[in-house]
Amino acid sequence: MKTILVEISYGELLDKISILEIKKERINNSEKLKFINDDLNLLKIQMHKVTKSKNFKGDEKLKKLFLSLKEINAKLWVVEDDKRICEKNSDFGEKFIKLSRNVHFLNDERSKIKLEINNLTDSKIKEVKQYTSY
């Protein structure tokens, strides 16, 4: 198996884990689930190594932030599915606009949580975002 080893922030790692957990819960295709489970196990092993090697003072806080991240990613999953239904039906009216706007709001929340995770874990890699204010 070929892999690329690259450093990522704690926020990004937890984000990836949360998305894979959501996929594991919602995808029924056994072939896809095999890949999802493999990826999830690899990432969880790495996270376990890191948290075990470092004494995180904010372990409970980290768990709460992870759950918040997973909740937001689950909402994004539904919103994106609903947008695809609108696309399929060529429905680009109010519902589509509302869903599209929700993606921005949810991604802004997601970004804040990832930054909070990075600050809590003293991650040397930080995800920086800048968008036009609304």
Predicted features by range, described:
Residues 1-134:
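Extended, charge-rich alpha-helical interface modules
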